[in-house]
Amino acid sequence: DGVEDIRALYRKSRYGSEEGSVAAATVASPTQTKTSKAKANDGVMTHSFGQHLPSWRDVMQPHPDVAEGRYRAAEFAADLAQVSRGEGVIEYRDPVEFFARTYVTEGMAGLLVESLQRISGQGGEPVIQLKTAFGGGKTHSMLALYHMVRGGIRVDHIPSLKPILERAGLQTLPKANVAVLVGTALDPTRKKNPANLPKYTVNTIWGEMAYQLVTSAGKPDLYAIVSDSDRRGVSPGSEALKTLLNSCGPCLILMDELVAYAKKIYGVDGL
């Protein structure tokens, strides 16, 4: 709740309202169309739209940053790793701002509903592979999931989530422990010595996943489940992973740009 209070103060300072930058839609009057018969005997109708077509600015107002020329395209490439570190622009870090600028498509809604049902123990697919072309919204969809299940969201501030909850058969958002694995951000040659795991060194992507989950769950001692495998540079067995996930559950593991990670370790001895 404290984090959301700080976010609300930031939104009020930046946009003048705790509800954020939701643009007010100006509904233009219906477009007028002049219709006339070209000839009495051919039955052809001619339409004159031209001068009666309203400007797009009269139909929909752009966000203030776009209207004022403050929009920088480079800042708005979705970066899941950046958001998980608490970095990047507020429009991605703040759940209220993120969902205010996100149109929830039917495909995204289906993903969110399926995931919420799984996390809340109501079925749902345990593994979902997002298949879209470049720029198709995979990272954006994962960001939506990330914000939804980490806790601290006030649904009354995000109207677009209410239909999602209803479809999932839930009254409130379930909370999960989240691990974010982004191939472009991970460095397979660099080991990690987390302060909360003084006895261990994180060496592999499996170790990174376990480290994030046990940290989120507040159970750092559980890292011992995968520590031997991580130290030897091999993947944990299925029983070890099952024990880890059950002990830290419910869990959400988001994996993005794994091809980039595979390229880093291809042909490198010891990796």
Task: Describe these PLM feature segments.
Residues 123-124, 174-175, 247-249:
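Short loop/turn elements that form and flank the Walker-type P-loop nucleotide-binding site
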Residues 116-119, 166-169, 239-244, 249:
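Generic recognition of flexible, low-complexity loop/linker segments
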Residues 245-271:
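Conserved P-loop NTPase "ATPase switch" module shared by AAA+ and STAND
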Residues 115-123, 153, 213, 217, ...:
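Structural motif corresponding to the C-terminal cap of alpha-helices
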Residues 2-23:
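Long, highly charged low-complexity segments enriched in Glu/Asp and Lys/Arg with interspersed Ser/Thr
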Residues 25-136, 143, 149:
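Walker A/P-loop-proximal flanking segment of P-loop NTPase domains
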Residues 99, 128-133, 140-239:
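P-loop NTPase motor core
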